[in-house]
């Protein structure tokens, strides 16, 4: 996922998420409670395709020659098995987009639930964005802004 942001490659970003045609589950995203309230119906039917649309909308607003940066400050395994895993991570996503009214940095914590797809690639099937402070701009907020 970090490489997908570095390269601003939506196909590589999409490969991070479970697809029901190749995995036992479909992808689901749970935004922070604050973002769920703020962006209303945007997250109601959020899917793998929503992730692709958000990423492409964000990429379209980043000037040529610039790139986004995703950093996981901590990445802790909560559970590891041969076909599934759960991680908790703190993140900073910096996106030098051109929309003045939207913050360029999202920070927070996420819980990632992964499974091995039919090709034995690890993919996210559930992503829970966890609030870290009432005033912080989270990844959920960035998705809410660019996922519309």
Where are these regions (language model features)?
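Generic beta-strand hydrophobic packing signal
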Residues: 1, 73-75, 125-130
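Surface-exposed, charged secondary-structure patches
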Residues: 36-103
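A structural detector for beta-sheet-dominated domains
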Residues: 30, 71-75, 115
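Short, well-ordered alpha-helical segments enriched in acidic and aromatic residues
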Residues: 9-32
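Short beta-strand edge/turn micro-motifs at domain boundaries
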Residues: 84, 88-94, 98-148
């Amino acid at each position: 996922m970090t490489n997908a942001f570095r390269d601003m490659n939506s196909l590589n970003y999409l490969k991070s998420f479970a697809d029901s045609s190749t995995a036992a589950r479909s992808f689901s995203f749970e935004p922070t409670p604050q973002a769920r309230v703020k962006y209303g119906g945007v997250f109601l039917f959020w899917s793998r395709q929503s992730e692709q649309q958000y990423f492409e909308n964000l990429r379209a607003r980043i000037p040529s020659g610039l790139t986004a940066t995703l950093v996981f400050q901590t990445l802790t395994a909560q559970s590891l098995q041969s076909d599934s895993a759960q991680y908790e991570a703190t993140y900073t996503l910096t996106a030098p987009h051109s929309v003045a009214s939207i913050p360029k940095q999202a920070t927070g914590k996420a819980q990632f639930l992964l499974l091995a797809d039919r090709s034995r690639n690890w993919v996210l099937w559930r992503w829970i964005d966890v609030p870290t402070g009432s005033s912080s701009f989270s990844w959920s907020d960035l998705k809410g802004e660019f996922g519309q």
